[in-house]
Amino acid sequence: MNRKYTTAQFKGIVDGLREAFDDVAITTDIMVGFPDESDEEFNKTVEFVRNIKFADAHVFQYSQRRGTPAAKRPNQISPDVKEKRSKIIIAETQKTRDEFINRFIGKTMRVLFEQPAKDGLFEGKTDNYITVQIGRAHV
């Protein structure tokens, strides 16, 4: 994918952010199924996700775009494999997201309420991007 950094460099930046900022939320985008992605590479991605413990992630499948260098690469990944890998990464990021959110249960946090939600609730985000819903009586 022509990234200009390694996973070790990325982890170093994440570690520095977590050391500098209490309760920082580290989120990411993760593409699965890029051409030539081997089982070994995918498994390394899963381990990396577990190790970094992202607060949230947008997981998506590579899709071939005509005229791009990646579209011309051999070993395009099958839709079934991309779907399976996507589900695995989503499950892992849901675990780490839940772990992150659960750290704040019972804590008082600042919330910016921006919109009404369903059933008469208000919805907002904390400083570290956790979605919160409360009843009107608490606003």
Label the predicted regions:
Residues 72-136:
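Terminal RNA-binding accessory module
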Residues 1-56, 62-81:
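Conserved non-cysteine loop/helix-boundary elements of the Radical SAM core domain that shape
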